[in-house]
């Protein structure tokens, strides 16, 4: 599919860089450049107990679905809104095709494209990708922040943006003038000179690039999101590096208390106005350097051998009790992030001492050993409340008793009882896949391992239950459960 797009996109640069050779299209009140494909969309499974993400219909496999028309109010030729949410690559190709169409219609037209979305959604990446292909001028809204007004390291308040300067810059560029614009480098204000390239394309990227004051200046508008959950992780990981804060929990606190409330209030409403809407499926967990490798098996299946092995260690196991709350993310429309996909869920672990730890992870099955890239750190009750205020909901609670029998050389062997499953498990964890596999072979569990997560097994058990109340999990069922089991949470 991507090759078909690329062969078509390869012509764009020549269209944009040699505009004198481009012929105008026929003047008509409404122009259809590509016949839209028939839509046969199915509503994906809204059931929270679903074990896998919904499968998207394969759209746009043959052609780009782009429509153009004359605006009856302005008299300008413009791109109609694409009525579907696109993948990152699809959105990139559609944006480039939209530029090509406008250029074909009026070779002298200066085209301004705006890209908006939450922090970490991929705005800069998309802008650079489009800019490199069409030789466009890229402007970041972040450079127009009034540094003297920044307080508490909050760069995300729209009142900090010098919109007057942004608007005057765009207008002057449209008049083919050379302009001096600000440039923030290491939190210090510098400046740079820019002018239009021969392609006559301006790309403005930033959280507020589709705000009401800027939209009238845009010829093409693009909204990009990755679901609050993925954006949250990406923001944490980037913030740890760039913010100068001491820990990831400080960054998370800032995001839950400042960044995403700002997004919900000031950015999200403008994204609905975009002509092209993109849902980025980039997985930030792939950036984690040291994943945890896990192998587990049911204890009762080989109880006698396990007991002999554990006894041979000649240790008194360390016993710990945990309560794991699983939060599923808020939803971005019908084509947004799947709440049913357990890979999108966040685990909040409460220890017997009242401490909370948050874990973002994906578990990938690979033979007898699962690979679990993860991000884990301690949080406060206030931060947990911040996540709930962003729209996260409690989907399940699993209580476990853990006996740590071995913890040496980076390998941990535990015997765990999951109350809700009413089963014991032997589990091996470590940062070396080879060492985890060696330990699993010694315990003779490589052929009897359980690859599924405890969360998956929990929902599988609920499905089999004859109790109609559990045939389909509803948020209220679990919310009432946590209130009952954690009455002392407010006292922490």
Curated annotation (Swiss-Prot):
Gene3D superfamilies: Hypothetical Protein Pfu-838710-001, P-loop containing nucleotide triphosphate hydrolases. GO terms for biological process: CTP salvage; UMP salvage. It is an enzyme of class 2 (transferase). Pfam families: CYTH, PRK. It catalyses: uridine + ATP = UMP + ADP + H(+); cytidine + ATP = CMP + ADP + H(+). It comes from the Eukaryota. PANTHER family: URIDINE KINASE (PTHR10285). This is Uridine-cytidine kinase D. It comes from Dictyostelium discoideum. The gene is udkD.
């Amino acid at each position: 599919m991507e090759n078909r797009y690329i062969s078509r996109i390869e012509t764009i640069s020549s269209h944009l860089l040699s505009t004198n050779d481009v012929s105008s299209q026929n003047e008509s009140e409404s122009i259809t450049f590509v016949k839209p494909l028939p839509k046969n969309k199915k509503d994906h499974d809204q059931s929270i107990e679903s074990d896998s993400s919904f499968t998207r219909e394969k759209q746009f496999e043959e052609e780009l679905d782009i429509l153009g028309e004359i605006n009856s109010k302005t008299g300008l030729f413009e791109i109609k809104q694409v009525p579907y949410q696109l993948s990152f690559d699809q959105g990139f190709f559609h944006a480039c095709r939209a530029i090509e169409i406008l250029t074909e219609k009026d070779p002298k037209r200066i085209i301004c494209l705006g890209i908006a979305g939450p922090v970490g959604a991929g705005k800069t990446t998309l802008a650079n990708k489009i800019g490199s292909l069409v030789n466009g001028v890229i402007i970041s809204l972040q450079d127009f922040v009034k540094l003297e007004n920044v307080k508490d390291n909050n760069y995300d308040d729209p009142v900090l943006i010098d919109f007057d300067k942004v608007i005057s810059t765009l207008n002057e560029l449209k008049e083919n003038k050379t302009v001096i614009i600000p440039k923030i480098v290491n939190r210090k204000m510098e400046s740079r000179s820019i002018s239009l390239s021969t392609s006559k394309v301006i790309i403005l990227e930033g959280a507020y690039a589709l705000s009401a004051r800027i939209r009238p200046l845009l010829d093409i508008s693009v909204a990009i999101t990755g679901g609050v959950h993925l954006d949250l992780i990406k923001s944490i990981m980037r913030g740890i590096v760039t913010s100068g804060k001491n820990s990831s929990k400080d960054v998370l606190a800032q995001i839950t208390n400042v960044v995403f409330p700002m997004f919900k209030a000031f950015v999200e409403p403008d994204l609905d106005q975009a002509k092209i809407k993109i849902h980025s499926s980039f997985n930030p967990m792939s950036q984690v350097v040291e994943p945890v490798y896990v192998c587990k098996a049911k204890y009762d299946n080989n109880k006698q051998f396990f007991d002999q092995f554990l006894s041979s260690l000649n240790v008194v196991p360390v016993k710990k009790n945990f309560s794991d709350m699983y939060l599923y993310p808020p939803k971005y429309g019908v084509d947004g992030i799947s709440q049913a996909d357990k890979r999108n869920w966040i685990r909040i672990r409460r220890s017997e001492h009242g401490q909370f730890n948050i874990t973002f992870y994906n578990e990938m099955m690979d033979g007898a050993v699962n690979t679990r890239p993860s991000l884990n750190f301690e949080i406060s009750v206030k931060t947990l409340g911040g996540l709930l205020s962003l729209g996260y909901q409690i989907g399940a609670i699993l209580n476990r008793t853990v006996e740590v029998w071995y913890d040496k050389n980076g390998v941990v062997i535990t015997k765990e009882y999951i109350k809700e499953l009413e089963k014991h498990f032997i589990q091996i964890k470590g940062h070396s896949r080879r060492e985890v596999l060696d330990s699993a072979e010694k315990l003779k569990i490589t052929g009897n391992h359980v690859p599924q997560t405890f969360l998956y097994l929990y929902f599988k058990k609920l499905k089999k239950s004859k109790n109609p109340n559990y045939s389909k999990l509803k948020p209220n069922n679990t919310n009432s459960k946590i209130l009952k089991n954690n009455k002392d949470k407010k006292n922490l």
